Structure formats: structure tokens, C-alpha cells
């Protein structure tokens, strides 16, 4: 879309009116230019490049460069508002160290694992990549090649990657960095409901009576949603906000009931609430009897560590997600052990605060939304935490209805739309299908026009296991795209860097900037970013949003989609598929993987002319409307069974649509009659992801963390983010205003803990764990206020790699890393 000056000024007026109405008004970005008459700025819409909220922005470009951004007043998510990061989106692509040429480690003009980076051509880059991948495939087979992708990939980039890896190279060693943030939510949804992603939407905010935050600092991590919650709370005196965390943060400033609990004891608190509901006869029996079943989960499942780790060897049921049926009475007996007295003692939360929280959930007149993010998910029992929260909503019937429901928030712009829905996990296929299910593989092979048996049934290496296999020399040709896992991954010293520098391995990193991960690689490929390409993201409320390419990338930088498809041309089918597989479909003989995967009569069916009116480098290069072909093929996976997506062209007109989209209408609340087209008249509620239409209430206990403070390492360490920076700071630290606002990471610490160590605010300390150490400065004031015995350190700072300290323990069911709990000691530097 192109806006006239009048339209643009009108948009500003709408945003101003929203501010007058009581919503915090945005301050326009310092570089925003408003007179299109004088500057001839072209405006178009795009979703924000940062978190999973899915705010829409207006992007202003001039002379081939993005020069301004503003919150989109027509966007239902953010209603014209931006957070501080969104204000400066126009600057994220223009860091001085932007990469524009492939770079290979070389000595004397030849590849050398220990050489220095030198520029090469794209042909040279793909030549050596193809050589290394082909050699690995020939000598070790498909299990020795892999890819680490991203919840920041566009939908079609993730889909193209899934096709290349799972079908083309015939390996499931594809996993996204969303494994580190959303995998526990995925498994939690699947176990309880049989389908992934939230049943509610952001419209719940304006209809809820109360909000409960479980391990989610929405004030800094989802500030636009927090502005809507704040507006609801401050405009309605009876609305309540309850916040639970292992330390106080900015969200506590609005809390009616703030609770700081001992790490890992959220499990016990959740069971206490279920017990309170039962003991006080607040169970919604009509709902429970009709729509739920009870099961007891297997316990003592380990901590996702290496099999040689003593903790893993001690586990009686390592990695087991099994469960057995149980009655309501047995469930009631199970949670009866979690009484107010014992849970208060275990968690450290005063009894009156716990009881106030339980009363809120139990009150049938109160509509409650539960929000959580990494506090639940990055947890060695993260799946259990998700399941236990669902228990509370199911026992009370406060679910799938306007203003009530559990809601897992996402941290990346397309962790839902790309990682989860497309299925770029090591065990998944599109639309909740999995590689271990023969019927699902058959569906994928049919849609992709592949011979039976192309997709392997073996689950691939998940994120943490990929690093372990790199270190052990079992994963040898490896491509990292659109993430900075060397900085973001756990236990960097022992399990991260060794694999990248293993002489047996060839590591490729695609990125716009020379990140920590890129600098550990053998080959770096320069990447186009955000509106330098056409894209699609899926946000936390199931909203799929499209954008057009609005500017060209720097000469030499190519989109991830271009890289994936162009690289596929380097492989003949005979080089990667066994003869018996080719014999099932002789017509593929002599073809390249590009021909089979992307020129299959479906992906290439739309002429490039259909993308006229906007830039589209990929359409021009490949000769067809690549994005439309990939999307329409992908959409066939979900249509007709609850994952319906609208036709491609509809998304370019809308500000996003929430799936399932049936007959052009989006779905706001799933599983509820009157809102969800898959629930028939008279059913009321049906959790149709389960064969019997019933959700599962699980009996699951409190179990301790993998590592806790002891005499030597006497403090808990929790890691996370801050408002001004996003993840590893690759983009935000290159924005001068954001860098100045929070230039360096610090260690947030209780003043008495600092005093006991002879440390004053601002002084340097050494933080060490059993795995490594970092030097940083202490902060005893400000936004984060840890209790005694716990410290918090953000991970955005490449000069202070906090993940040298963290433990690579994971949830055994989801394989998601626990970044919130390990033991450290702090001494004055």
C-alpha cells in the first residue's frame, strides 16, 4: 500500500486519539519524516522484526533505503503503538559491519579450518558447501548433515528448509532456535489438547477480570500487550493483576499480588491451586465431566543431560512422557499433598498471597487469563508446568471463552508461524504432523510429489543434541541460519564452541552481521533481512501476517530463501537418494533437488508477474512467484482439519488473519461453539485435537531442579532479556539509541548479597559456575530486584557471554533448555 500525506497525517491523528483515550502514546522515532509531499517517502505495512507479539508497523522507504517506521494505527494488535525497539526498526539493517560477501576461512587461497576469513564469490561458497555436504553424505549418510534454523525465518523460508532437509537430503536433523523458547509449550499443548497453539487471542485482554503472569515479564518482553493490560487494569478498578517470578521486575509495579518464589517451586504452587479448587468445591463439574479426562504422568524422568551424567543415570524413567488413566478421586488425593502450609514453606511465598491467587482462579464469577513465557518453558519440567496450568483452567472451565484461558506467549516473530506451524523441528512436519507417524509421512510425500519412503522416520537431533553431536564428530556438515546460537545456546564452553571448531566438521552460518556464531564458523553467507525480502510471520495469537519486499538488500546479500533454493541446484537426485528410492519414481532421474522440490509444478505454478507492483528479488531470479507457490503448497497440509490458512493474496490485503480461517472468516476462540467452525452446534466445547474430544488433566508432581546452590556455588543464576535489546543484540546493539540506553550487560544482585561480598554497585565481579566464568559489573538498583541468593544477567551482550555459565539441562519431553536455574558463585574481581 502507498499512503498519501493526508492519509499518513490521519494515521498519526488516530494514534494520538488512542493516547488521549488512556493508552500510553508512542513517541515517534527520532528519524521519522512526516511530509511525503516533500520527501516522496513510500509507505507500506510489515510486522515488526522483533518479538512474537506481532505488532504491525508502517515502513517508510526513500531512494532504496528504509528511513522511517511508525506503529500502524490500523493494526488490531498494537493499534498504532510501538515499543522502544519498534521505534528504531528503520536502523536495524544499517549497521556499519553489515556483511555483503561470502567469507571463507582460508590460508594461501585455500580453505583452512584455522585460517582467516577472506571474501569469496557466491559460486565459490556453494562449491565448497556442496563438496562438504556431498562428501559427508557419501561417507557417513544423512544423519551426519544438519541445519539449525529459526523462529525468525519467514514462513516460506522455514518451509523451503524443511523440504530441503527432510525430503531432499533425507535427514530430520533440522531444528529451530525456537527449541530454546517454545518447545515446552508445544509439547504441553499436544499432551493436553492434541493440537498446538493457544485457543484464545489478544481480544481476551479487554474482556478479562484478572491476569496472572507466570514467569513472564510482559512489561519489558511484551510491552505492547502490557500496555493493553495496563489500560484494562487502570480503567476498571475491579480488575486484578497477579505476578509470579523468581525475582521482582517491572511487571510487579502493576501487580495487586506480586509473588517471588524459589526456583522450580512453581510446580508445587500450581498443584496447590488445583487442590484449593477441589477442597473448596469450586470444580466446574459440568465442564469437567463432559470435556476432560484424568491421567497420571510418569515421574523421575531425568534432566535431558548426556547419558553419562550422574543425574541422568539416576533417573528411573529417563525422557518418558508416558501416562496412565486415573479417576478424579485419585487426582484429588494426588494434589491433596500440596496444601497451603507445605507449599508456602517450599516456595517461600507467604500463605496469604498464595491463597489470594487460588481464590481468584476458584471464583466462578472471575474471568482469568494466565500468561507465561520463558519462566515456564525454559524449565526442566516446562511441559509439566504448561500441563499444570491447563489443569487449573480445565477444572474451573475457564478456557476457550472470551476473557478466560491459558495463553503461552512467544518470544520470536514467527516461532509459531514458522517453527511450529511449518514444522521445522526435528520431529515435526507441517500442521502438527510428525515424522514418526507413517500416515503423516505419506501425506507429506504425496503433497510434495515424492516417492514413498523419502522422508525418514527417525527423529533428528534437537538443538542441544546437535551441539553434542558436533562435538562428538557425528554431525559434520552443518548450516546455521537466522540465529546466533553460539551466544544463545547453553554451556558454550563445554558443548557449544568445541563442536564448531572440531576439525571433522564444516560449519556454515548465514547472517547479516558477524555474530559470535558467524565468527566461530568456517563459511559465512551474507543475508538479506526483514523488508529486504517478501515475508510472512505467524504471531502468538495464530495471526499470519504478510509483507512485501520494500527495499533491496546491500549488493551481495541474499535472502535465506534464495540461499536454500539456489543451493539445492547443486545436488543431483542420484547424489543424495538411494537407487531403490529413485526406482519408485524413475522420472526424477537426472533432476536436481531444485527441480524435484521447488520446480515440481506446484511451487512454480504462479508466474512472477503476479508479484508486480512490489520488489521481489526471488521471483525475478527464479522466474516464478516463489513465495506464493511455497505458501499455497504448504497451506494444503492444514486445510480441512483445523489448521486452515486463507488464500495467499488475502494476507497481503489484511493486517493478519488468525487461523483456522474458514470461508474467509478467522477464528478468535478455538474449541468453542459459536467461534470455532470445527465445533458443531450443540457441542458447546470440543477439544477436537483428541480423538474423544476431551482435554487431559494430568497428575504431575513437584521435582527439584537439575542444579541448585550449594556451599561452593551458593547462588541461583537466571538469564533473560531487557526491554532495550532483543535476544543476542545482533540487531538492537547496532542501533545507537538502543545501545546507549543499555550499553553493557550487568549482574542484578540483592544489595545485601553484594555487601556480603565486599562489592559496591558498579564494581566488577567474576561470576563462575562449574562450566565457566564471566566478568561483569554489579547492579543493586533499578528495574530488576532479585531476592537474596539469586542473581539475574541478560544475554544480549556479546562481550559478556553469560551462556559460558549455564547448564545444558533440558526438559526431557520437549528438549528445551533451562536457562533460568543453575548454580554460580560471585566474587569481587
Swiss-Prot record:
On cofactor binding, the record's note says: Binds 1 [4Fe-4S] cluster.
Which metal ions or organic cofactors does this protein require, according to UniProt?
Answer: [4Fe-4S] cluster; Mo-bis(molybdopterin guanine dinucleotide)
Residues that hold [4Fe-4S] cluster according to the record = 48, 51, 55, 83
- Give the UniProt subcellular location, in the record's own words: Periplasm
**Record GO biological process:** cellular respiration; Mo-molybdopterin cofactor biosynthetic process; nitrate assimilation
Q: What reaction does this enzyme carry out catalytically? A: 2 Fe(II)-[cytochrome] + nitrate + 2 H(+) = 2 Fe(III)-[cytochrome] + nitrite + H2O
Question: Which HAMAP family is this protein grouped with?
Answer: Nitrate_reduct_NapA
What is this protein's function per UniProt? Catalytic subunit of the periplasmic nitrate reductase complex NapAB. Receives electrons from NapB and catalyzes the reduction of nitrate to nitrite.
- Supply the name of the protein: Periplasmic nitrate reductase
Taxonomic lineage from the root? Bacteria, Pseudomonadati, Pseudomonadota, Gammaproteobacteria, Aeromonadales
